[in-house]
Amino acid sequence: PLKWDNTMALCNRLHVQRRTLSMLETTHRLAADLESLAKCERGSQIVQALESADDEVLAALWAAAPQAARPIIKEYAARLRHIHPATNGTTLRNLGLKPVPRFGRILYNLRMAWLDGTVIDQDQEQALLAKLISEVTQ
C-alpha cells in the first residue's frame, strides 16, 4: 500500500475531486483504528468512531476490516446511525430555553443514552431531559 503522503501526492497529480479526497482521508483515518473498533461494546462508542463515514467509506472499511469488526460496521450502517432522540432544538426552544451551545450537549447526551440503552422509551428520555436541563439552568 502507498504511504499516505504518496497517496496525497498522487491524488493532487491526478486532480482528484475534493469529495473523493475527503472520502480517502476519512477511510485512511478510520482504517488505521479498525482493531480498536472491534473492541467497541457500547453503541455510543461505535457511533463516535464511525459517524464521520459516509456509505462509500463504510463499504471500504467493511471490506478492509478484520472479521471481528465487520458486524460492528454493519450494525452501525443498518441501525445505530439512525438512532436519535425525539427531542430536538425546537423541543428545547418550546420548553422556553434560549438557544445556546449547550443545546448541542443536551441533544448529544440524549442520543448517547439511547445508543447505550440507558434510555429505552419516551418516559425515560423525558426524565433524562429534565435532569440535563436542570444541570444547564443551575
What is each model feature region?
Residues 1-138:
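C-terminal subdomains that position terminal phosphate/3'-OH groups for nucleotidyl transfer/ligation
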